[in-house]
């Protein structure tokens, strides 16, 4: 099973904007075909971003989006990350560190600073935008119930 780390903007694509590039990720996540990992720092950032006025969310809507996401992810414990390249945007370093610590296969992001690091062979995981990550997902199959 693929293990994914989603940056905050991709989470917003899934749970707020319904971006078409991210729909296959949402389908795979809801269908249990991928494992999505988060930690306290990434969840804290999401909680903070959901209060931004430009999203035009009521407090109830923000809580709902946070709850829906946090119910679908596995919370990974905090810990020491291996040596990693430095992301130009220091706020995004936490996503690199989480992907390395949890042995993710893919860090899914639209952030240019993170995407610039994708050619690094020492990472141990791929850094892809939502469309490229979606192309790697297994085809969705409905589970039949007896």
Question: Predicted segments — roles?
Answer:
Residues 41, 63-86:
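Acidic catalytic patch
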Residues 8, 89-93:
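Conserved glycosyltransferase catalytic-site signature
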Residues 85, 93, 102-106, 112-146:
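Acidic, PIN/NYN-like endoribonuclease modules and their adjacent C-terminal/linker elements
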Residues 28, 98, 117-119:
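Hydrophobic/aromatic ligand-binding patch that stacks against planar heteroaromatic rings
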Residues 1-19:
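Metal-dependent nucleic-acid phosphoesterase active-site entry motif
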Residues 8, 40, 110-112:
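Short secondary-structure boundary segments
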Residues 55-56:
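Membrane interface segments of multi-pass transport proteins and intramembrane proteases
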Residues 5-6, 22-51:
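PIN/NYN-family metal-dependent endoribonuclease catalytic core
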């Amino acid at each position: 099973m693929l293990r994914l780390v989603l940056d905050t903007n991709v989470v917003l694509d899934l749970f707020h904007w319904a971006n078409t590039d991210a729909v296959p990720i949402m389908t795979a996540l809801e269908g249990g075909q991928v494992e999505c990992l988060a930690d306290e720092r990434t969840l804290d950032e999401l909680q903070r971003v959901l209060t931004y006025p430009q999203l035009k969310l009521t407090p109830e809507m923000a809580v709902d989006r946070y709850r829906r996401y946090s119910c679908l992810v596995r919370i990974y414990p905090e810990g020491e990350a291996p040596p990693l390249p430095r992301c130009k945007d220091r706020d995004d370093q936490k996503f690199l560190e989480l992907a390395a610590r949890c042995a993710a296969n893919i860090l899914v992001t639209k952030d240019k600073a993170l995407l610039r690091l994708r050619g690094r062979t020492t990472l141990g995981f791929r850094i892809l935008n939502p469309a490229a990550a979606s192309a790697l997902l297994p085809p969705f199959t409905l589970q039949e119930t007896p």
